[in-house]
Swiss-Prot record:
This protein's name: Probable succinyl-diaminopimelate desuccinylase
Named cofactor requirement(s): Zn(2+); Co(2+)
Pfam hit, one: Peptidase_M20
Cofactor note: Binds 2 Zn(2+) or Co(2+) ions per subunit.
E.C. code: 3.5.1.18
Enzyme class: hydrolase
Amino acid sequence: MTVLSEQDKIRLLADIVKIQTENDHEIEVCEYLKDLLSQYDIDSKIVKVNDSRANLVAEIGSGAPVLAISGHMDVVDAGDHDDWTFPPFELTDKDGKLFGRGTTDMKGGLMAMVIAMIELKQSNALKQGTIRLLATTGEETEQYGAQLLADEGYLDDVSGLIIGEPTSNIAYYAHKGSMSCVVTAKGKAAHSSMPHLGTNAVDILVDFVNEMKQEYKNIKEHDKVHELDAVPMIEKHLHRKIGEEESHIYSGFVMLNSVFNGGKQVNSVPHKATAKYNVRTVPEYDSTFVKDLFEKVIRHVGEDYLTVDIPSSHDPVASDRDNPLIQNITRIAPNYVHEDIVVSALIGTTDASSFLGTNENNVDFAVFGPGESIMAHRVDEFIRKDMYLSYIDVYKDVFKAYLEK
């Protein structure tokens, strides 16, 4: 049963695109969604992080099993609005595309889930189980909205979790984790004409970086068997087959020294230097392994001078490749999107890291949502109108089928 017209569905997306949630103000989307859901007798609750940032939780149905569905309300900065063909915070419908910041990442997926809930509720189609909507704040930064919901127990009883990030018609059963590591070297300043009176922090940090580079090389020589298989995703995006060595890069552990800063002026011995690393973790090389690795290299190079700080750490999430959510998606979605659904692991991260951790409870898990992932964070971001609309029907059928398993 269709409750909302195509025009209504586009209008609802336009309404939340209009709300400027560039890393803030998600509470305005919460209030909008709460009012919308109440019109269809769906109760919801706003869970605040602070006065401007909040999550929304809503439910339909009752009892077990519980299927959590989730999307984030924040968007990345739109940059210079003059660079956009159309205003970034006004939905523009042109040539079968819906333009606007967040249409793909990921207000399109979020609203598709909300509308699917509304239509299932109005048609009384849900005969068993509970659908729990978790609309989150702060996914684009530190996932603190998702972490708050996890800490307050909103995931404790779930059997399945769908994240509606844009996936280009790929169903992801797992994804890598992500860590940010900051290594600081502290030396002793001195005049450059008398460097022996100082301790060069840059030299110390260079030694650390070089040793860590060798450690990473050694790891990659043995990083050949992966629980997470990201090859199908990469081959679809690259439109070509990839070889065995390349597959080890995409499916395995990745570590990058992306920032190096040291010294302030040319005639002084630098007393401080910092190196920042982004690490993509996998089940075989998780956050505990990474922490131990950094501490080991620090001890070897010079623990009197070096420290490491880890400002963010999000676990890899894995589930069975053929879990019931994935099975339902691959069976149902082709009827609406008119192509077979590729199943893969994702090389990025989602709120599931905070929701599930390493998924020790073996929750059925899928990342699957409307939009082309390549459009995320871009100027002139858009989602195809037919894709947005079709995923509403996909979600309705997948939610219902999963709960009736």
